[in-house]
Regions:
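Interdomain helical connector at the RecA1-RecA2 junction of SF1/SF2 helicase-like NTPases
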Residues: 227-235, 463-562, 579
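Conserved RecA-like ASCE ATPase "motif II neighborhood" in helicase/translocase motors
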Residues: 375-406, 410-421, 428-442, 616-624, ...
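Inter-Walker segment of RecA-like/P-loop motor cores
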Residues: 348-390
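Conserved segment of the helicase C-terminal RecA-like domain
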Residues: 670-699
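Post-DEXD/H (motif II) to motif III coupling segment of the RecA-like Helicase ATP-binding lobe
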Residues: 412-497
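Conserved C-terminal RecA-like helicase domain
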Residues: 530-637
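ATP-dependent helicase/translocase motor core
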Residues: 1-329, 338, 342-353, 383, ...
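Catalytic cores and motor modules of nucleic-acid processing enzymes
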Residues: 15, 19-20, 46-61, 65-67, ...
Length: 852
């Protein structure tokens, strides 16, 4: 009868590897002092580098050749790290030796191909590795006699699991053993269901990360479950490790391309499973389908997105098909200026070929220079990218891979149009009429066939899904690759920010007549009244008191007494008032901490001008660094540091602003960064209710999808509606576009627009609001839809160009700004409404563009 024990699990893995042309290694050939299988290493060197051995023999002057070589190799590994030696080789007495050969892109060079085929992969079971005791490892994988990975296996049918394997590494594998300090890249603990991995053994402090496929295996398909772990298959759940990852070519790619040196000596950055998976799947589909595709990668916060982008950029540079390089250049575009340099540093560190990474900080000439200098990966921000478009006609015959970081915020339409201009085919330099000019303008806004687009986003908007997502047979749009928020939380890479959510409700008694005043538009007056109450010194004073009481009662002892909080406000004025209230109450109560404030620009209040720098008494660029200091515990923000801001000590958020959609997810997600001492988070919300927050998060918890394509009739419907208001005539639309084309004087443009503004002002107030809303919707919708319309319609383009300028001149909001003269706040109080864990199902679906 079959015994389902640990040995049978080892048998299964070994059998598969031996069938894959691994060598069955002999534990007796392993030199414990050198940490090498000396026989296999020397066999590899004799086969691939006999001339170097001969030269080394001459320089040795009769001494023990193998002994000296092995000792030199050991010392270099301990000095430089195994990864560097595998990638760059080792020099012995001036003779250079390679220790591994990567797979060449083709077989043009017989010697290179032969050397690659001469790599010796071996598997050793029950390896006794120590000179101090008789401990053994279940399994070790070697490449050319050098140990790469160790394995501890557990069979769940024998009553043990991956947890026991991890404990075995922590308790029974001394981190001081030579094999574990310098001579291996990673250590795998696994059972039949789960795989965990560590790059450094540190005894009880050893950290193991999941190396699992995820229940959806990276797929964005809608019918798949999402979360941590591995999906059920027709084999053992963890079979992918030996059936795919440990296969020869896969292993070479992994160690030579997807493992990078870490920040500390002899440490490495090992690609997580989803990072390895997305890079490989994208390269495979590009090799299969060629240039011109669009791919959406929805990877949650905590996915290591910057590293994924760096690995992908480096992989695309070297990608070839039929012995031809697929892309001439890889452009990496980010919408966060402060990350431009950071991302460049990561890509440079990850790229195996040095000197091929450049950054655009000025304009088009610098881009041309970068390409002529052989820069294959070029990094820029959205803010700089439009300036490099005009003087680069030579680029338009090249093929591009365009990697877009944080595509959710950059894909309203205009950004993709700028990219399309860069990669578009060159136009003849000739005289052209207005119709030809507009036709070219429309074409320039569309995606170009000589570029592939790779869009990364944790929270893709409907437009992003339609532009870059894959369309299913049911017409829905889904991401090409998905690493869900649910999986990131379950794997411990981010915290669940909705696990402790507190909502407050406020009650106010006001004396006011504005709701019955005909001079005030009712809905707008109500909105102003709510803002008046929210920003009133009484309410800010009361909310500040609640925040500080909560912080010093429950929060400040978290993270071993280092916890910090962020206050989300809805305006610079509100941020300023909160900052003053915090300063006063912190001083009054004798609390030992301070607050910082963050907002852009300046605000003038009661004749005095304030800025972030003047209030904090430091340049605004210093604010994030100052917030790291222990005495600064509160950061009060107004539309700043709500995206892309990583501060692991941030534990609690106080929200006094309406949040919805992607902005809600991004803002609250500032809390999700992990820290060894951070066990939980807390949100205290004065404005939003629990259901509103759940609605915002639902689309991004598991799979995200768009229910169908946009209705291409919508811009035509909006155009008809707008025409019916008779704010402009068709003759005026034509004349305005001709004036723009002919570079008419500014006064002529204003004269044309003023006539339309006069007609707009004569409309009923409700009709004014309708026209304004429809005009904004048209501009936003057209910017997006023009990229995917399968035809040209110049009339849509003409109206778009008119409305972009007209809407800037339309008068808005005639209600007096100062309502304090007709409103008085008499009473104000706060009550806790709810304290709960907000539970997500991930069942929501986004809707396509709709006309207003």
């Amino acid at each position: 009868m079959q015994r389902y024990n640990e040995k049978s699990f080892e048998d299964l893995i070994e059998k598969h590897l031996l069938q894959s042309k691994y060598i069955k290694g002999n534990p007796k050939d392993y030199d414990k002092a050198l940490c090498l299988d000396t026989n296999l290493l020397w066999e590899f060197l004799k086969t691939t580098q006999p001339k170097q051995i001969e030269e080394l023999q001459k320089r040795q002057r009769g001494t023990d050749l193998q002994k000296n070589f092995f000792e030199r190799l050991k010392s270099q590994i301990e000095k430089e790290g195994l990864l560097k030696i595998l990638k760059e080789g080792v020099e012995v007495l001036g003779v250079f030796f390679k220790l591994a050969y990567d797979k060449p892109p083709n077989q043009k060079n017989p010697d290179t191909w032969k050397n690659y085929q001469s790599n010796l992969f071996s598997v050793v079971r029950q390896l006794h590795y120590s000179t101090k005791n008789n401990n053994s490892l279940d399994m070790v994988i070697f490449l050319n006699g050098l140990p790469l990975f160790s394995f501890e296996l557990k069979n769940k049918l024998s009553g043990q699991s991956v947890v026991d394997a991890i404990e075995q590494y922590k308790k029974d594998r001394s981190p001081h053993e030579s094999l574990f300090t310098h001579h291996t890249l990673a250590h795998f603990a696994l059972d039949n269901d789960l795989v965990y991995m560590s790059t450094k053994l540190e005894g009880a402090k050893t950290h193991f990360s999941p190396f699992n496929r995820g229940l959806n295996d990276g797929s964005g398909e809608l019918d798949r479950e999402c979360g941590a772990g591995n999906p059920a298959t027709d084999s053992i759940k963890t079979a992918y490790l030996w059936e795919k990852i440990l296969q020869k070519d896969s292993l070479l790619h992994l160690i030579l391309q997807m493992i990078k040196p870490g920040g500390k000596s002899n440490t490495v950055i090992f690609a997580r499973y989803h990072q390895l998976d997305v890079v490989r799947k994208l390269c495979q589909i590009v090799q299969k389908e060629g240039v011109g595709g669009r791919y959406l990668i929805q990877h949650s916060a905590g996915s290591g997105k910057s590293n994924s982008i760096a690995w992908l950029a480096c992989a695309l540079v070297g990608l070839s098909k039929q012995e031809k390089v697929i892309f001439d250049s890889v452009l990496v575009i980010t919408d966060r200026i402060i990350l431009d340099r950071q991302l460049q540093d990561i890509i440079e560190a990850f790229c195996p070929i040095k000197g091929v990474v450049g950054a655009i900080t000025k304009g088009s000439r610098q881009l041309k220079e970068a390409i002529s200098e052989g820069k294959k990966i070029i990094i820029s921000t959205i803010q700089k990218f439009p300036y490099i478009l005009e003087d680069i006609p030579s680029m338009r015959d090249k093929k591009f891979a365009i990697i877009i970081d944080e595509a959710h915020s950059s894909q309203g339409g205009k950004y993709a149009q700028d990219l399309a201009k860069t990669t578009g085919k060159d136009q003849e330099n000739q005289q052209e009429d207005l119709e030809t000019f507009l036709s070219k303008a429309i074409q320039a806004k569309k995606f170009q066939p000589n570029a592939s687009y790779f869009a990364f986003s944790a929270t893709p908007k409907p437009e992003t899904l339609e532009l870059f997502g894959m369309q299913t047979s049911q017409g829905k749009f889904i991401p090409f690759h998905l690493y869900s928020m649910k999986q990131a939380i379950e794997e411990g890479f981010i915290l669940d920010v909705l696990a402790h959510y507190i909502t407050y409700k406020d009650y106010a008694k006001v004396m006011s007549t504005i709701l019955n005043d005909p001079h005030y538009e009712k809905n707008l007056a109500l909105k102003k009244l709510k803002r008046y109450i929210r920003d009133h010194p009484k309410s800010i004073q009361a909310k500040t008191e609640v925040m500080l009481n909560h912080f010093y009662s429950y929060v400040h002892t978290q993270i071993k007494g280092r916890a910090k909080a962020m206050v989300i406000t809805d305006s610079r004025k509100s941020a300023l008032e909160y900052f003053k209230a915090f300063q006063a109450q912190l001083k009054q109560e004798g609390y030992p901490h301070k607050a910082l404030v963050a907002f852009s620009g300046e605000i003038n209040l009661k004749g005095k001008t304030y800025s972030e720098a003047s209030l904090n008494h430091m340049p605004e660029t210093y604010t994030p660094k100052a917030f790291e200091k222990d005495d600064y515990r509160f950061l009060i923000v107004a539309d700043k540091y709500q995206t892309g801001f990583d501060q692991p000590l941030l534990h609690t958020m106080y929200v006094d602003k309406v949040l919805s959609g992607v902005a809600c997810v991004q803002t609250l997600s500032r809390l999700n960064r992990t820290h060894p001492d951070k066990k939980n988070t807390c949100i205290l919300d004065f404005v939003n209710n629990a259901q509103e927050i759940i609605k915002a998060f639902e689309p991004y918890y598991k799979q995200n999808s768009l229910e169908g394509p946009s209705d291409l009739n919508k811009p035509f419907d909006l155009k008809t509606h707008l025409n019916n208001y008779e704010v402009y005539t068709q003759e005026e639309v034509e004349a305005f576009n001709l004036a723009l084309f002919n570079n008419a004087h500014l006064f002529q443009i204003h004269v044309m627009l003023d006539a339309m503004v006069q007609r707009y002002s004569a409309l009923e107030k409700d009709l004014q609001q309708e026209f304004y809303s429809k005009a904004k919707a048209y501009i936003k919708g057209y910017e997006f839809l023009v990229q995917i319309l399968p035809f040209e319609d110049i009339s849509l383009e003409k109206l778009f160009r008119l409305l972009v300028e007209l809407i800037k001149k339309l008068p808005r909001d005639k209600n007096p700004e100062d309502i304090t003269k007709v409103v008085a706040l008499k009473q104000y109080r706060l009550e806790k409404e709810q304290e709960a864990k907000l539970t997500l199902t991930g069942q929501a679906e986004l809707k396509p563009f709709q006309a207003v």
